[in-house]
């Protein structure tokens, strides 16, 4: 079994982002990715990861308003995992790899093949795209971060465009948009790192909360879902070998 610990925060209390790679115990086993809803923990990461791999996982495919879903049940007798959610539902389309199928409405035990724990900042220091978008009224433009990574094994560069937020810009300010992108955002990001969670997400540390980042606390972490950008890449390969080198910004008018 493989275990990975990504310490993006060194505080005594942190947000735990846990992801499992499991194999269904079946004659025709399905391969699944399971991510646990984030939870707060003050247990040392090294101790927590040891307990995370000693759990029993049951999976059942169900139908919901959001489409095919998986009902996850995690059983553990460890007091260390008392804060971890043990019953939750995730998207089957994201969880199952393209070659795997699960029987409908049948509860199946799974074997853990790998477990990843990422230590993020505490809950009030985390922000998502949805959090920012909800605070924008009558948006006129979108801010896209172009995050550049270098594959340290091949020296090839990959640019991942990620939607950050929508903003409202008055007509008289349109000419200064480019200047905003190169000044207010210049020192906004200190690093960006890919972590395994719900497939893959990008964690951006924000140091300057002016302009487009005014609703984000300084030194907080901004979480961006990468969606299908990296679906053909190995999670372990990407998290191990991709190094963030630069971030540029693009401000685009919202199309009708």
Curated annotation (Swiss-Prot):
Keyword annotations: Host cell membrane, Host cytoplasm, Host membrane, Host nucleus, Host-virus interaction, Membrane, Viral matrix protein, Virion
Topology within the bilayer: Peripheral membrane protein
InterPro entries associated with the record: Matrix_Pneumo_C (IPR055461), MATRX_N_pneumovirus (IPR005056), Pneu_matrix_N (IPR043062)
Pfam families named in the record: Matrix_Pneumo_C, Matrix_Pneumo_N
Localization of this protein: Virion; Host cytoplasm; Host nucleus; Host cell membrane
Entry GO terms, CC: host cell cytoplasm; host cell nucleus; host cell plasma membrane; membrane; viral envelope
Gene Ontology terms for molecular function: structural constituent of virion
Family as reported in the entry's similarity comment: Belongs to the pneumovirinae M protein family.
Assembly mode: Forms dimers. Forms higher-order oligomers. Interacts with glycoprotein G (via N-terminus). Interacts with protein M2-1; this interaction directs the matrix protein localization to cytoplasmic inclusions comprising viral proteins L, N, P, and M2-1 and mediates the matrix protein association with the nucleocapsid.
Function: Plays a crucial role in virus assembly into filaments and budding. Early in infection, localizes in the nucleus where it may inhibit host cell transcription. Later in infection, traffics to the cytoplasm to associate with inclusion bodies, the site of viral transcription and replication. During virus assembly and budding, acts as a bridge between the nucleocapsid and the lipid bilayer.
Name used for this protein in its record: Matrix protein
Species: Ovine respiratory syncytial virus (strain WSU 83-1578) (ORSV)
């Amino acid at each position: 079994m493989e275990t990975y610990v990504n310490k993006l925060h060194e505080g005594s209390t942190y947000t735990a982002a846990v992801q499992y790679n499991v194999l269904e115990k079946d004659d025709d086993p399905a391969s699944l990715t399971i991510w646990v809803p984030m939870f707060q923990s003050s247990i040392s990461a090294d101790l927590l990861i040891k307990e995370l791999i000693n759990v029993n996982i049951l999976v059942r495919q169900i139908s919901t308003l959001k489409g095919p879903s998986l009902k996850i049940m995690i059983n553990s007798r460890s007091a260390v995992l008392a804060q971890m959610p043990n019953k939750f539902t995730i998207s089957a389309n994201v969880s199952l790899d393209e070659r795997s199928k699960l029987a409908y409405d049948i509860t199946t035990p799974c074997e853990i093949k790998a477990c990843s724990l990422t230590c993020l900042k505490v809950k009030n220091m985390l922000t998502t795209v949805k959090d920012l978008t909800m605070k924008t009224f009558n948006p006129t433009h979108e801010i896209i971060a172009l995050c550049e990574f270098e594959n340290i094994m091949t020296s090839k560069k990959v640019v991942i465009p990620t939607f950050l937020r929508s903003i409202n810009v008055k007509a008289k300010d349109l000419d200064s948009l480019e200047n905003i992108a190169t000044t207010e955002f210049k020192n906004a990001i200190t690093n960006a790192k890919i972590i395994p969670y719900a497939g893959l997400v990008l964690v951006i540390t924000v140091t300057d909360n002016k302009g487009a980042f005014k609703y984000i606390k300084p030194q907080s972490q901004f979480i961006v879902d990468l969606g299908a950008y990296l679906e053909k890449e190995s999670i372990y390969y990407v998290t191990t070998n991709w190094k963030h080198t630069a971030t540029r910004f693009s401000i685009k008018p919202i199309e009708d």
